[in-house]
A protein has these predicted regions:
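A short beta-loop-alpha structural element at the N-terminal edge
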Residues: 3-17, 28
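Conserved beta-strand in the GNAT
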Residues: 58, 66-76, 92, 97
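Conserved acetyl-CoA binding element of GNAT-fold acetyltransferases
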Residues: 84-100
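A short helix-loop-beta-strand connector motif used in the catalytic cores of GNAT acetyltransferases and
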Residues: 44-58, 92
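Conserved GNAT acetyl-CoA-binding A-motif
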Residues: 112, 119-131
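Conserved GNAT-fold acetyl-CoA-binding loop/helix
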Residues: 23-44
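Conserved catalytic-core motifs of GNAT/GCN5-like acyltransferases
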Residues: 76-82, 88, 128-130, 134, ...
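Conserved acetyl-CoA pyrophosphate-binding loop and the N-cap/start of the following alpha-helix
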Residues: 102-114
Length: 156
């Protein structure tokens, strides 16, 4: 299996390609990729911050030089602490995506394992994610458990 590595600024276009694959598989949304051009500068900058709160781990595609096979991205948020988590550092996983022709090879598991270690190293005691039905078995096997969430969202 190809090695997991941290995504670099020069991976930004491939990171967005894989994110789009994930979006297209989960949501009945606008298939346009016009938003990629606006997103690229910020993504490149974030990928270039070695000590930032955002990270992406990738696996290079074994059959397509220059392409990525898998992406896992996450961020750490600070929330005021509580008894079970005095530091208040919470990891959030998003954009777990594998190229359709590279699935079932263990890439997502390898990237997730690397991301979870990154969270641990930075003091996160909890990690959250939203799982698709197809991906839930992977996350459960890594120790995630369903949690009822009264989350409300406002789009500004």
């Amino acid at each position: 299996m190809s090695a997991v590595r941290r995504a670099l600024p020069e991976d930004a276009e491939e990171v967005l390609r894989l994110r789009q694959i994930m979006i297209d598989s989960l949501f009945a949304s606008d298939p346009s990729i016009a938003w990629h051009a606006e997103s690229l500068p910020t993504l490149r900058a974030k990928l270039g911050e070695p000590d930032g709160d955002f990270v992406a781990f990738v696996v290079e595609h074994p059959e397509r030089p220059g392409a990525l096979a898998c992406l896992v991205a996450g961020t750490i948020d600070y929330r005021i602490g509580k008894a079970a988590d005095p530091q208040g550092m919470v990891g959030f996983v998003f954009s777990v995506a594998t190229d359709p022709d590279a699935r079932r090879r263990g890439y997502a598991r390898a990237c997730m394992t690397t991301l979870l270690e990154w969270f641990r190293e930075r003091g996160a005691r909890r990690v959250q994610l939203t799982a698709s039905p197809q991906a839930e078995p992977l996350y459960v096997s890594l120790g995630f458990r369903p949690k009822p969430d009264p989350l409300l969202e406002l789009t500004l």
